[in-house]
A protein has these predicted regions:
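Conserved glycine-rich cofactor-binding loop
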Residues: 12-13
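Catalytic loop of short-chain dehydrogenase/reductase
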Residues: 129-169, 181
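C-terminal substrate-recognition "lid" of short-chain dehydrogenase/reductases
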Residues: 209-231, 236-237
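Conserved Rossmann-fold SDR core element
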Residues: 157, 167-182, 224-231
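Substrate-binding pocket helix/loop in short-chain dehydrogenase/reductase
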Residues: 78, 92-102, 196
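Conserved NAD(P)H cofactor-binding loop of Rossmann-fold oxidoreductase domains
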Residues: 84-90, 234
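Conserved glycine-rich Rossmann-like NAD(P)H-binding loop of the short-chain dehydrogenase/reductase
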Residues: 26-42
Length: 250
């Protein structure tokens, strides 16, 4: 039996790699997108039952759209697009960095939105299509750090309901998935992450596999279109005046 296909952007590293392995184990044909880590994506692809690697820099929206159109033309059952790739660079609410802002808005908001639109319009799927935008618990619990990144994630979050409302097929759905602090980020060392990763309501380290399970549920389960799930052990329910990366150093 033919396998349903999923495209995962940023699938060579971190959460994207966890997603690729989880979907592969669940019987999907996994299309791993990579930017600068093609060899790492190929290593993961070689371990999966059915997989392939595609490469492009998401800063170039036109090239990303060409990638989507190529996949739409040759995949017979492309059911899911997971926009997981993101750039995470520091700036702050009192000192926006124009270059960081431009890159964040392009890679974290504009390109994934355009990819979603092209996928929804052109992909062939048996049983409905799913878009899963990776967001951040910062959409509910913002702080002044990583200012441009956070703005871009808010922008992407705003598209979830709008894209969902625009779909005429009830089997086609658009979701948001918002993780919290889950892996060491930016310039953190593991000892710092051991502290920051527990800065949530349950005071526990959230396992990336929990996020992969949530994505798989969205891909094949029943959840109303336009919804966003938080997988952060309740971090978004806390008031945090700074990014936990910096709170862990205080």
């Amino acid at each position: 039996m033919a396998r349903p296909a999923v495209l995962i952007t940023g699938a060579a590293r971190r959460i994207g790699a966890v997603l690729a392995r989880r979907f592969g184990a669940a019987g999907w044909h996994v299309v791993l997108h990579a930017g600068h880590s093609v060899s790492a994506a190929e290593d993961i692809s070689a371990t999966l039952p059915s997989a392939e690697v595609v490469a492009c820099n998401l800063i170039d929206g036109a090239v990303a759209l060409d990638m989507v159109e190529d996949l739409a033309a040759r995949l017979d059952d492309w059911r899911v697009l997971i926009n997981c790739a993101a750039v995470f660079k520091p700036d702050s609410a009192d000192a926006l960095n124009p270059a960081v802002f431009a890159e964040a808005m392009r890679v974290n908001a504009e390109t994934p939105t355009r990819m979603a639109q092209a996928f929804l319009a052109d992909a062939r799927a048996k049983g409905g299509k799913r878009v899963i935008h990776f967001l951040d618990m910062k959409i509910a619990n913002p702080n002044p750090d990583f200012f441009s990144y956070t703005m871009a994630k808010h922008a992407l979050a705003s598209t979830v309901k709008m894209l969902a409302m625009a779909q005429s097929d009830p089997a086609t759905r658009v979701y948001g998935l918002a993780p919290g602090a889950m892996l060491p980020s930016h310039d953190q060392v593991s000892e710092e992450h051991e502290i920051s990763g527990r800065m949530n309501l349950l005071q526990r380290l959230t396992d990336p596999e929990e996020l992969a399970d949530a994505a798989l549920f969205m891909a094949q389960g029943w959840l109303a279109s336009g919804e966003t799930l938080f997988v952060d052990s309740g971090q978004h329910l806390l008031a945090q005046p700074r990014d936990v990366l910096y709170l862990a150093r205080q």
